[in-house]
Amino acid sequence: MQGDDFAAWAMRPLAVAALIAGLTLPLIARAETAAPVCNAPSDLIRLANPLSHLAQKLASRETITIVAMGSSSTAGAGASSPTASYPSRLAVELKGHFPGQKIIVLNRGVNGEEVADMLKRFDQSIIAEKPDLVLWQLGTNSVIRDAMFNDNGAAIRAGLAKIRAAGADIVLMDPQFAPKVIVKPEATHMVELIATTAKSEGVDLFRRFEVMQRWYEVDHLAFEAFVAPDGLHMNDWSYACLAKSLGLAIAEAAQRPVVSATAMPHIVP
């Protein structure tokens, strides 16, 4: 056997081994990084009040406009792309619940904003869009900056009054359950303040903090599974799961008879 032929023959098993390794490693990686199951109990994600304005638009088959107002976790910080943000994923979820219905979800999240900053752009970012539903995510930046509201929720109520005057349904969303949030002593106080304000004002609240807390404490997911490497923002999986949960909650509340107390089914991943 000539030298060149021998070299080619000797290298053949190595090439085959390399090929096998190249095919096997991605399979192993995929198995190791399998996405967690998206699960949230119906009693945790169920909205307290029906979404009556949204229900009217569904009944008349008119275009539905939803504005997602908030800070970086609405804008999509931590996501791999804008299409992985929760408002983008929510649009997909709602179109699945209401096939043929034209639904527009506008992302009006701005990184770093607190309630006072958002109020300054309410007219342009919310009212001008003539929304049927406003999702208002708030509270996180005040917590991480140790700048708790000192007005007992007056600024939130001012924003709610403005949205209500525009005729839109409202869903508040509280902070995320993430390491850089829960380390702050005022985190729980903020969650309670938002919940108390929502109840006293008769508007809906999506309890994001509790949903994510359940992922950690009940489903035993590591923070790395649903929080970005910065320890603050959500990631693609958690934004998608948030959108799935919120989409189901909105769909149920928009179709709920006012006197109904029927529980929603669990999310099917």
Mark where each language-model region is.
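N-terminal secretory targeting modules
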Residues: M1-V67, G76-S80, K95-Q101, E129, ...
